[in-house]
């Protein structure tokens, strides 16, 4: 959520920045709403003051033994007008808030202007794609040969875009998540957290999934039903519950940064993805991910983005998987992001790089929604924190990359060296 003061006082500048990411801000409507809000605010305050003044006269008149009925009627009439003005002001403020919640974050000035993924900027590459002297198989074929990926069973149990993993493939999937968690907690300084997979609407508003992206979630009740304590949604990413741990909190600045990680399943309806990546593990309704979250002082967040992205890169480097680092353009960034790097891993069967991690600085966009603040030790003043998040990594897509990059001519999969301690010393599976 953007700063309301910016929307009031720097509207043209805000509109220009939003236009860079392809969002057209209705400047005229916002101006009209703000003018109407000011009028109603003045009217409400004036009626309140007048009613208070006339109420005091009733007591004085009563003490003098005068007839107070005319004054009482006048006060009642003022009260009715005040209630009506307050109701209109509340309605308008809710409309203004609803509009504000639908406006995306402002892109940082360092973000390249562009329309879509074709305008993203390649920052760097790591590793060289392996050359094969045999016909490369994709991860689906490799997994089925090993008896470890069963999509037919998942269709029977649930439907499309789910999978049943078995045997050494399931073990490797678990090993990858464990390896990532150990790396982030033991080497990168993150606190491991275990969080609910179902969250309430306030949590989803806090990180920006609601109200705009309700259709992308799996809900326990229809979204249009009034939210209550039992109206939950499955998390689309651990970013949602982990970041919301600081909602409505005031943190001491010396305690920052907070660095937290969690391994969770993630659930997405993939609305709008019909026909895309229908084969295999790339685009699933349920998938595992190890998420990293940082809560920082405002002045530290850009350096934290570089650090957090480096932590995701380290996973790929230790697994010896070739990848490239992309700086997303304004038109390809997520709704709440101010700046985002994507890491794309090399998939031999597709002969291309595919996203495996997205690392973003959300600036104070989520913090304002969550009212997450930090307090200075010296002057005791509070200000909004900055929030960052990144995949470290998507476990299923990492499994895809390992299967394809480590495949052998006979269909076996070499186990990456860093995973062998998690797999009982196995060197090959399949």
From Swiss-Prot:
Binding site for ATP: 268-270, 355-358
UniProt cross-references to Gene3D superfamilies, sorted A to Z: Bira Bifunctional Protein, Domain 2, Serine-tRNA synthetase, tRNA binding domain
Keyword ATP-binding found: yes
Keywords associated with the record: Aminoacyl-tRNA synthetase, ATP-binding, Cytoplasm, Ligase, Nucleotide-binding, Protein biosynthesis
One GO MF term attached to the UniProt entry: ATP binding
Residues at which L-serine binds: 237-239, 291, 391
First-listed, main subcellular location of the protein, grouped into a coarse class: cytoplasm
Metabolic or biological pathway: Aminoacyl-tRNA biosynthesis; selenocysteinyl-tRNA(Sec) biosynthesis; L-seryl-tRNA(Sec) from L-serine and tRNA(Sec): step 1/1
One Gene Ontology term from the biological process aspect of the record: seryl-tRNA aminoacylation
Enzyme class of the recorded protein, top EC level: ligase
Reactions the enzyme catalyzes: tRNA(Ser) + L-serine + ATP = L-seryl-tRNA(Ser) + AMP + diphosphate + H(+); tRNA(Sec) + L-serine + ATP = L-seryl-tRNA(Sec) + AMP + diphosphate + H(+)
Cell compartments where the protein resides: Cytoplasm
EC annotation from Swiss-Prot or TrEMBL: 6.1.1.11
Pfam families: Seryl_tRNA_N, tRNA-synt_2b
Record's GO cellular component terms: cytoplasm
Subunit structure: Homodimer. The tRNA molecule binds across the dimer.
Record-linked HAMAP family: Ser_tRNA_synth_type1
NCBIfam families reported in the protein's UniProt record: serS
Family in the record: Belongs to the class-II aminoacyl-tRNA synthetase family. Type-1 seryl-tRNA synthetase subfamily.
Record's function text: Catalyzes the attachment of serine to tRNA(Ser). Is also able to aminoacylate tRNA(Sec) with serine, to form the misacylated tRNA L-seryl-tRNA(Sec), which will be further converted into selenocysteinyl-tRNA(Sec).
Domain writeup: Consists of two distinct domains, a catalytic core and a N-terminal extension that is involved in tRNA binding.
Entry protein name: Serine--tRNA ligase
Native organism: Yersinia enterocolitica serotype O:8 / biotype 1B (strain NCTC 13174 / 8081)
Lineage, uppermost ranks: Bacteria, Pseudomonadati, Pseudomonadota, Gammaproteobacteria, Enterobacterales
Encoding gene (name): serS
């Amino acid at each position: 959520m953007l700063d309301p003061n910016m929307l009031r006082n720097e509207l043209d500048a805000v509109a220009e920045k939003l236009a860079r990411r392809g969002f057209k801000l209705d400047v005229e409507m916002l101006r009209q709403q703000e003018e109407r809000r000011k009028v109603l605010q003045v009217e409400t305050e004036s009626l309140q003051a007048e009613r208070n003044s006339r109420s005091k006269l009733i007591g004085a008149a009563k003490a003098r033994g005068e007839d107070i009925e005319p004054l009482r009627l006048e006060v009642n009439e003022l009260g009715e007008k005040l209630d009506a003005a307050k109701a209109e002001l509340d309605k308008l403020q809710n409309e203004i808030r609803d509009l504000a919640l639908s406006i995306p974050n402002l892109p940082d000035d360092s973000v390249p202007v562009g329309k879509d993924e074709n305008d993203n900027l390649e920052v760097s590459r790591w590793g060289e794609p392996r050359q094969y002297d045999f016909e490369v198989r994709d991860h689906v074929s490799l997994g089925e040969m090993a008896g470890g990926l069963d999509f037919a069973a998942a269709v029977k149990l649930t439907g499309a875009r789910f999978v049943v993993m078995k045997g050494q493939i399931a073990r490797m999937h678990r090993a990858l998540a464990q390896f990532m968690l150990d790396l982030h907690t033991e080497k990168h300084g993150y606190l491991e957290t275990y969080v609910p997979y179902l969250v309430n609407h306030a949590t989803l508003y806090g990180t920006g999934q609601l109200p705009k992206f309700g259709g992308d979630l799996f809900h326990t009740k229809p979204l249009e039903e009034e939210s209550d304590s039992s109206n939950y949604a499955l998390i689309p990413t651990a970013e949602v519950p982990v970041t919301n741990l600081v909602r409505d909190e005031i943190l001491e600045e010396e305690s920052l940064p907070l660095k937290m990680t969690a391994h969770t399943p993630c659930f997405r309806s993939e609305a709008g993805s019909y026909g895309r990546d229908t084969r295999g593990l790339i685009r699933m309704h349920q998938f595992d991910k190890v998420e990293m979250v940082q809560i920082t002082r405002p002045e530290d967040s850009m350096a934290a983005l570089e650090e957090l992205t480096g932590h995701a890169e380290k996973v790929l480097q230790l697994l010896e998987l070739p990848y490239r680092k992309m700086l997303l353009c304004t038109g390809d960034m997520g709704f709440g992001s101010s700046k985002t790097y994507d890491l794309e891993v090399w998939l031999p069967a597709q002969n291309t790089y595919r996203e495996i991690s997205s690392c973003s600085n959300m600036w104070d966009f989520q913090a304002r929604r969550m009212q997450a603040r930090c307090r200075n030790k010296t002057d005791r003043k509070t200000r909004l924190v900055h929030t960052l998040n990144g995949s470290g990594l998507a476990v299923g897509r990492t499994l895809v990359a390992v299967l394809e990059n480590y495949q052998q001519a006979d269909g076996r999969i070499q186990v990456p060296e860093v995973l062998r301690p998690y797999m009982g010393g196995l060197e090959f599976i399949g």
